[in-house]
Structure formats: structure tokens, C-alpha cells
Regions:
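Charged active-site motifs of nucleotide-sugar-dependent glycosyltransferases
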Residues: 7-8, 140-146, 178-179
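Conserved catalytic-core segment of nucleotide-activated headgroup transferases in glycan assembly
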Residues: 20-21, 26, 33, 152-182
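Short, charged/polar "capping" segments at the starts of alpha-helices
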Residues: 46-52, 155, 186-192, 245-250
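Active-site regions of enzymes building and remodeling cell-envelope glycoconjugates
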Residues: 57-65, 84, 95, 191-202, ...
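Mid-sequence helix-capping/hinge segment at a functional interface
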Residues: 92-160
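Donor-binding and catalytic core of enzymes assembling or modifying cell-surface/extracellular glycoconjugates
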Residues: 163-242
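Nucleotide-sugar donor-binding patch of glycosyltransferase catalytic domains
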Residues: 230-291
Length: 291
């Protein structure tokens, strides 16, 4: 059997950005069963803007952007042919219509990668948390609150508070002395006319990540950005609700199924039934004070 870097692995999860981060603990398991192996980390071309966040990860030997936006091409298949262990990077849901009432997203991604629950349970608590290396310089903006207000490139409204909710809390934050930096998709609505509010959705994705990393904390929703800053171990508040429906099954149990892991346990999840608008703004403001 091949050993060390001669043993090559293709994986882990190519899209979407949040999913690729949720799947990072699979690398910890692979390192246990194939020590010192060479690991290709495939990223779908449509998510290539996120590639820099994976630089310096200790268990990623090479990042490979797929030949096509959403699937592999000849170059990808040629590499896979040389690999000794291949993980389906676009797998089906492990347990469609019910997983979100039983487990969180990290465990679901682990099972979707083809491994067993018993193997997931063997990981330590730290190994179950996605990790990213904060390798770039960060400019501290300790008086600025970052918000990533909308999910799914602004198209999945049920996963986030309404515009009205955001406008109200931004006004309260600014009146309390904070500056507010709005990150996300460039087509998202502007939420304030205040000089202490800035919209940065026109910046590149990676520039947004770098700028946000210097803020006091970020307020996110059920979206990939929450997983990025959780993997960096940065302070964050995540606004959650039971929005999800799959195969006619509603999300009624395991309320934190969509909560991001935070590598340094610096995430506070605020959950409300039916809508994020039901999360009390006073609770959000108090949570910021408590950080």
C-alpha cells in the first residue's frame, strides 16, 4: 500500500461555500485513517472566489478549481484517476427530508462524504469544528459591527430578518455609537442613509472577508459567511429560525441544526420560531454588550 504523500485523496465538497467549510472536519478523519496523505481540495469554479480562505490549511495540499462552474472536466478526472481514495464532492443528501430534525450540518456533511456516524463520534470536539487559518493581515475596526443581513445571495428571504427589521436595528446600533458595515451580495438593498453605515457588497468576496475580520463582531444569518467567521474563531452572532422544508417535511426539532460551529466558541445563536423577525432586537443589542 502507498504511504505518506504517495497516497493521494480527492475531496471533499466542492460547493457551496458554506458546505465546503462544513465538510472541513472530514480532513481530520482522513488524516487519522490515511496519515500524511496528499489531499486535493476540489472547489467548484462558481465558488472560486472563496479559494483564498483555504490557504495555509494544514491538511490541504492542493486546491483544485474545477474545469467547469458546477462539475468536473478532463483535467479534474485525470487527477482523480491518479488518486487512491476519491470522495464524491457533489453528493446527495444523506437522509433527505429528515436530517435537519436530527443533526447539525457538520455531521450531515460527514455522512454525505461516505463515512459512518460512529467515525464522526470518534472525532474530538475540536476536530468536529471547521478550522481556517487567518493568514492575512487584519485592520482592526473595534467600533464597527459587521452585518451579513441576507442569505442565499439575497434570494432566500425566509432565512433572514426583513429589510424593515434590519433598518430598525441599524438605526439603534448607530444611535448607540456603533458604525455598521454591510457585507454581502452587490444587489442587496441599502439599509440606511447614515454616514455611519457603509455598504461593502461591491467589494470582492475575499476583500469583504478581510475587512469583516477586523470588525468588533459580525451578525450573520443561516449563510456561508457565518461558517467562514466561525472557522476563523471570530466573534459572531447568528440569527436563526426554523425556515427549512425538504420533501414536505418542516424543521420542527433540533432548532440549531443550521447554527455554525465556532472554532473558539465565540458564537452566540439567537433563535426564534417561524421568522427571524421574531428575534427581539433588544436581545441582539444586549448580546453585543455582553461580548
Amino acid at each position: 500500500m502507498k504511504t505518506d504523500k504517495n497516497f493521494k485523496i480527492w475531496g471533499i465538497r466542492s460547493a457551496l461555500i458554506g458546505d465546503t467549510i462544513m465538510a472541513l472536519p472530514v480532513l481530520n478523519h482522513l488524516e487519522k485513517i490515511f496519515p500524511n496523505s496528499y489531499k486535493y481540495f476540489s472547489i467548484a469554479k462558481k465558488c472560486s472566489q472563496a479559494a483564498p480562505i483555504y490557504f495555509n490549511h494544514p491538511l490541504i495540499d492542493r486546491i483544485k478549481i474545477t474545469d467547469f462552474p458546477e462539475h468536473n472536466g478532463d483535467t479534474d478526472r485525470a487527477i482523480m484517476k491518479e488518486c487512491d481514495f476519491i470522495i464524491n464532492t457533489s453528493p446527495p443528501v444523506y437522509e433527505s427530508g429528515s436530517w435537519f430534525n436530527k443533526r447539525g450540518q457538520v455531521e450531515e456533511c460527514f455522512l454525505m462524504a461516505g463515512f459512518l456516524k460512529s467515525e464522526f463520534d470518534e472525532l474530538t470536539d475540536e476536530e468536529k469544528k471547521p478550522y481556517l487559518d487567518l493568514w492575512f493581515d487584519v485592520k482592526k475596526e473595534s467600533n464597527t459591527i459587521a452585518i451579513w443581513p441576507f442569505a442565499g445571495y439575497g434570494k432566500w428571504l425566509s432565512r433572514a430578518p426583513s429589510e424593515e427589521w434590519w433598518r430598525e436595528i441599524i438605526d439603534k446600533l448607530i444611535k448607540s455609537g456603533w458604525k455598521v458595515a454591510h457585507f454581502g451580495w452587490h444587489e442587496e438593498p441599502r439599509l440606511s442613509e447614515s454616514e455611519n453605515y457603509s455598504f461593502l457588497g461591491n467589494e470582492s468576496f475575499f476583500d469583504q472577508v478581510k475587512i469583516c475580520s477586523g470588525c468588533k463582531l459580525s451578525i450573520c444569518t443561516d449563510t456561508g459567511s457565518a461558517w467562514i467567521f466561525g472557522a476563523y474563531g471570530l466573534p459572531q452572532i447568528t440569527l436563526l429560525t426554523n425556515h427549512f422544508v425538504q420533501d414536505g417535511v418542516r424543521h420542527t426539532e433540533y432548532p440549531l441544526a443550521f447554527a455554525p460551529e465556532n472554532y473558539k466558541d465565540l458564537n452566540i445563536n439567537l433563535f426564534a420560531e417561524d421568522s427571524c423577525d421574531n428575534i427581539k432586537q433588544e436581545l441582539v443589542l444586549q448580546t453585543i454588550k455582553d461580548f
